[in-house]
Structures are given as C-alpha cells and as structure tokens.
C-alpha cells in the first residue's frame, strides 16, 4: 500500500476529516492537518479494529461497530447464543462458514487495504471479544443509531443491523472497484454476488454455504419498501440501501420482466415481422401504411408547381416533397453550386423539377409586357419638338449659351427663370418649339444612359474657340457616341481675338466629327453667347436636324415619359421633373414611375405657371409621388389606381430580389470564366495616364490583343486622374479602368467600390498589357494587392540640417503609419513612390497619426516636396489567387 493523505483516507472511509484526525491522535499518530501523509503501517493501524477490550460504554459501542459487523450476521441468522458457541472455535468449526463468509464480504469491499488485517484477526483474535461483541448489540439497541457515525474503514460496514448491514457492505464495494452499477442492480440476487467474491478472493472451502445464509436472510427479512426506490438508490448510500429488503425474489421477477419487455420493444422496432398478441394490430397497420406510401403517386394536377419569377431551392424541395439535399445533388450534377437558400429562375426550376417528375408553371406578372407601348398608326402621329442637351467644358460658355437662348425667347419678367432649377425648358422659334434639358453635367447624362433612358434627341457640343478641345469635351463626345445621339458642334467665343475655330475643327476630326465644309456629316456653328452672334442659326440647325430625324409622337393616348430629375421638397413632398415623350398627361391621372406610384395633383411648366395638361416633348414639374423616383425612371400614366399600386409593389419585390442576387461588374479575374460560358464577347476598357504618349501606346497595344473570341474595345482614353465621370462611364458600359501613374480621386474610389467597377493601377505599361493578355487566356494570378491607408496634404515644408526636407502635413483621410509605403502626388500625378523614413508629431516620434491631426513626414531619399502635394500611404497585401 502506498502513502496516502489524511483527506484521501477519510474519503475512502466515508467520514469527516476532523473525525479521522481525532482518531489518529487517539492512536498516537502525529498529524498536523488533513494534508499530512500517512505511511502504510499507520494506515493499517487506523483501519484495523482495536484488540483491547472496551473499558467504557462509548468506547465499547465504537468497537462493536468496527469489529462486530462481521459477526453480527451470525447473531442475526441464528438464536442469540448460537453465535457465541459458533465463533469461539477456530475457523474450521461447523458454523465457521458464516464467519468466513463475513470475512470474504469485508475483503470484497476493500481488497487492497483491509484484506491482510482481517485475515490475521480472524485467525488470532480471542474468543471472548466476539462473544461480548455479539451479545452486546442484542442488549443495547441504541448502538444501532450511532453505528452510521463511526465507520472505521470503507471495507468494514458499520451498520449493526443484521442482514441489511451485510448487504450494505456489498453495495459499498462498487464505490472502490470498477464495475459500479452492477452490484447495485443485483443487490438481492445471491448468485451474481457470489461470483464476484470468487473472482476477488483465493479459493475458499466456505463458498458453498453462502446461499444458505442468503436463504436465511430472506426468511428473516421484514416486508420490503416500494421496489421503485430500490432501483434508483446509488450504491454509495448505505443509509438508503439499509432500509431496502434483503429478499431478491420480487426484484428478480421485475428485472426479468423488464428485460423481456425491452427485448420485445427492440424486436418491434428493428425487426418488424408477424407478431401475435399485444401490438400486432398496430404493427400490421404500420406495415400496410408503408406499402401504401410506396405505391402512392401524386395526381397530374398536383405535379404542377406554380412559381413567380424565382423560387429558392428549399421551397422547391418542400413543394415537390423531396429532400433538399437530393435536389442540391441534382443541381450540382448540372454544374450549379447552390445552397438551400439559393434562388432558382423559372428555366432552371423547370429543368430540375422534370428530374423528379414535376412541372413548373410561371404565374408571374410580366409588368413590362403589360406596360409596353403599343405601336401607333401612322395617321395618329404628329410632329413633336426635339429634345436637346447642351454639353461641354464648364469654362467654354455652356451656361452662358443657355442663358442667352432663354433670354432671347422668354419675356423679360422671366429672365431669371434659369434659377428655378427645373432642369428643362422650352424655346420657341418661328412657331416651333425646342426643349432644352439642363442636365447636371456629364454624370447625369451617363447615368440616364446607363438606365436605358433614351431621352435626348440631339446633343449640342460647346467648344471654346480659344481653348480648343479639353478633357471634358472628349468625354462629352464619348458619351454622345455611346448613346447613339447626333452631335451639333457650337464653337463659342468667336468674338475673342485669339479665337481659332479652324483649329477646333481639326482637333475634333480625331473623334470622327468632320465638318460639312470638309466633306463630313457633322454640323458646325460658330456662335458667341456674350455678343448673341449666330444664336438663331444654331436653333435653325437644331430644327433642321430634327426634320432629318423626323421626330413624331401620338398625343391622343396615355402619357409616357422619363424622369429628368427629382427632389424632396419640404412643403410639397416628392417633386419630379417629367419629360413627356408620348401621349398627354393630365391632372388627376394615376401613374407609376419605377418603384413609386401616385396621382398627378399639380403640374408646372418651366416658367412656374400651372398647367392642366402636358403633350409630347413638354417638360413639367409633377407633384403627387409616393416617394422620390430615380433619374431615368420611366413614367407611365394609368387609368386605375389599384393597378398602379400593384405594379409598384411588384417592382419593389423584384428590386429586393435583384439586390439579393446582385450581378457585380466584370473584373479581370472573372473574365476567363465568362468567356468560357459564352456570356462575354467584348471587353471594354477605359485608359487613363499621366501623358498622352502613354495613353496612345497603351490603347494601341490593347487593341492588338483582340481575337475572334474576345474583342477588346477602348471606349475612352484621356490624360489625368480617374474621376467620377470615368467610373460612371465604366459602370454604364460594363468596362474596366486602367490607370498609369495616376490615382483615382477620393470620391471616384468610393463611387467605384459602390458601383462594383474594377480599377487597375500600373506603373509599367507592359504589366498592364500582360495582365489583360493573361486575363483573356485565363492565366491571371493576382497575388499582391494594395491596401489604401490614408491621405495627407502638404501645408508646409521644413528644411532640417543633415536630414533634408520634412513635409508638415494635415491628415485628410485615414491615417499615416510609420515605415509604410508612400506615394507623393502632384496634381494627381505620381512624382515619387517609396518608403516613409520618419513620422513625428510635436518633435516626438509616433507610430501613427489619425485623421484631423497634423504631423511631420520624411520621405526616404527624396527632398523635392512642395506645398500642395499629397502624400498617400499604403501597404501591399498578399491575396490568394481566385479564378
């Protein structure tokens, strides 16, 4: 036996630490506390029963509880004097089997600790002690109550109750040995217990009489308490177990009954077959029900599933009565990687449902079909005024030309009408009207084109005679060509001495705009907005172009138009400028525009006058929307309010579904996959660079990459930073933007992220060409990506001896981090790219500086810093390849 702590021994003996400490001190064993270590001989000493006869009442009671338990069974099994005579002789005498049995039971409880001392005591103990001990409990019943308080060791059962005490001794055995629940469940069965004893003890000649003792126990035991409690009593609880009956007959019967019932249940569940007796009818019903389910086939009408627009995988599986995993497996075989919440369109749902014997019926309302414009009879068409948009560089006199045209054709009291910001107005010339749209620059024009709004009939391109073609002029030409709108060029400021109209004509030839004088088809008019020169000629050319286009519309039908612009007015609510394109709009008409509906409550023309109706090509301000519509939305007049609300609600639902499965703009990584699927034949690109030579070289190199599978189109190229206009053009044309030694403006970056436009930035031209080539071949492997950190403006430059120039900066966006990669921009052109050598704030080195603070930044091996420069810091991230 190894060394043991006091608290461990107390736990094994089932007594408190204090009680064990008291007993150890009474035995002369020096211990300090419950953590003290006991040697093997000390453990034997404290667990062994004392040999001296009891001298006082209390001591006698304690000794009785420690030593008599093994012999109390003899006293209980026979008359009071029989144990005295039976115990006195040696172990070999006739009653000895009972005594030996008791010894065996004690050993069974704690074989490692108690077996040696018990064996020695059974051989050498004097006869008087057992006699006195056996007689004493019979004469002193109070000891029975104190017995639970003084158990000396786990193997010795301290209950002085006859047979129950012995049973509890066996119950305590699982607390120490491994098979815990086994003795507890079979407490009343004698044969299993005997087998346990035979496994633990050495062969003993007294094994046979044990059943006789058990029979006697059964005979002398009072009626048992309810068996229910017996089944759930924990083996380590002697108190509860002591009250349980010693008889095992009833327990055996109940246990056997339970086993039989359990086996029957298992057979019914796992091995269904012909049964007799209880449960036969239920099983027969279940079997017959199963057969019916197998042969049942849904009716033809039930095999039709009605869906609207789309349906999720989970919903389709539920309606067909199949598992979603089976449906997903079929879709994966068809090459679709989907989840249970993935929406399926009608075609895909029809295809997969046919695999399971179902049909799909599309019950969706095709709103576009319902609202589609019916072609008009030629006799019902009448001429309509042309819709003209004036575009051009801001400094080239676009606003002045608009003011000059309005002032020449509007009464004096309405000269300031341009400040009403209605966005559209009418001009009359010789009894004919012209509608001008005051769109907010190129951005709105491109946005309307991106939404498919074919509003503008003619574009007037304003170019200053003294400046020539400017970047915004190039963009305006590209926008007009992309929209398929004819262009009339107005060369403004011809009254200036430095005006060179011929140079403007020559520069515009690069874009395919050749003057009629030089054998082309483009109309050029030289005007002066300030001096009112050639304004009538310009309007006549507009009407001439309109006659060539033969613009007509039917006024006698429900109105259709386009939202030019919209706003939320505090007093009037949502207000929109509507350009009526066909039909006539009247007050009181119900309408739908995009996801909004409403009723026309009031209309105003461009001069602010209330009107009751508006015909084709007439711009009016409409009040009565339920919400603010988007520019470019189609405005449709309806007869029924209910129908208008239904259409608006349907569009809102469709918009939500579209946003959930939003189609992102094409990036280089996705190009190869789309080519493989045959979805893309053209790749549009916008090229921006720091010098014109780079623009031309890159554009030409990209055009040479075009093949039969992919045609690469450079739809726009110019010098300068990447602007919001470039992003809008790329979004509308599904193009990518390539930048060389230029950076996007902050607003352009945010807008590109929102629109999903892919912007690629390079320092070397051949890298861009190689990337495009790899993308077309499906070999693009992007591994490095730049992460933008912050932007700072240089407000002061300090010269520090032995260090160089230090830039005093104000952090505009993000944060500056020491030792980060930096880029110095001057007029949005990259001047330097390298590493940040120092970052200080108030002469202290800092790790980073956040937005809104000032700091000093030093660039590694670079001193050419000027006030107004911009410093960007960034870091390079390694991104896993995704194709």
From Swiss-Prot:
Entries under CDD domains matching the protein: IF2_eIF5B, IF2_mtIF2_II, mtIF2_IVc
Residues the record lists as binding GTP: 392-399, 438-442, 492-495
Region span, Disordered: 118-261
UniProt lineage: Bacteria, Pseudomonadati, Thermodesulfobacteriota, Desulfuromonadia, Geobacterales
Start and end residues of each tr-type G domain: 383-552
Gene: infB
Designated name of the protein: Translation initiation factor IF-2
Gene Ontology CC entries for this record: cytoplasm; cytosol
Stretches the record annotates as G2: 417-421
GO biological process terms on file: translational initiation
